[in-house]
């Protein structure tokens, strides 16, 4: 999530969304134990709570990344839009793991579509890009 993103290559927020989701998929695909822990449905309350907290933290990071590159509109205070978008996409990935023991390319695409569809309820199609100052 914190790896550099080439700001000049971004045209719309959906470009950034795709980069972020592809990075998350790479993590899930590279580590079977993490994939099972994060995506498998399990009955352990402690694990579910830890997973939810992890999603909230990632949601905050994702908001910061999007806000760095685009001029975001006002978002609701009572719903963590980015965390919820990620959780919804994760449900699609989890379904793929349940059915196929992996995230198939088709279900990866569907998960990204769900992520974008939910964010699209809050982010207009065209967002102004920020002018990034060089990092020192």
Task: Place the predicted regions along the sequence by residue.
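Short, structured helix-loop boundary elements
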Residues: 10-14, 18, 48, 79, ...
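Short, solvent-exposed loop/turn segments at secondary-structure boundaries
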Residues: 49-51, 101
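Hydrophobic alpha-helical connector segments
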Residues: 2-29
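Hydrophobic alpha-helical bundle segments that form small-molecule/ligand-binding pockets
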Residues: 10, 26-37, 41, 48, ...
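C-terminal peripheral helix-coil segments that are non-catalytic and often amphipathic
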Residues: 26, 60-68, 82-136
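Helix N-cap and loop-to-helix transition residues
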Residues: 12, 31, 100-104
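General structural signal for alpha-helix termini and helix-helix connectors
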Residues: 3-7, 37, 44, 68-72, ...
């Amino acid at each position: 999530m914190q790896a550099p993103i080439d700001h000049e290559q971004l045209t719309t927020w959906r470009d950034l969304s795709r980069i972020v989701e592809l990075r998350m998929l790479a993590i899930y695909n590279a580590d079977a134990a993490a994939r099972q822990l994060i995506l498998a449905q399990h009955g352990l309350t402690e694990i579910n709570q830890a997973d939810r907290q992890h999603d909230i933290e990632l949601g905050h990071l994702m908001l910061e990344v999007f806000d760095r590159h685009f001029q975001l509109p006002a978002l609701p205070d009572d719903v963590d839009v980015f965390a919820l978008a990620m959780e919804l996409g994760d449900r699609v990935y989890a379904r793929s793991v349940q059915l196929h023991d992996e995230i198939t390319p088709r279900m990866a695409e569907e998960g990204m579509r769900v992520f974008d569809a939910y964010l699209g309820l809050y982010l207009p199609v065209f967002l102004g890009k920020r002018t990034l100052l060089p990092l020192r």
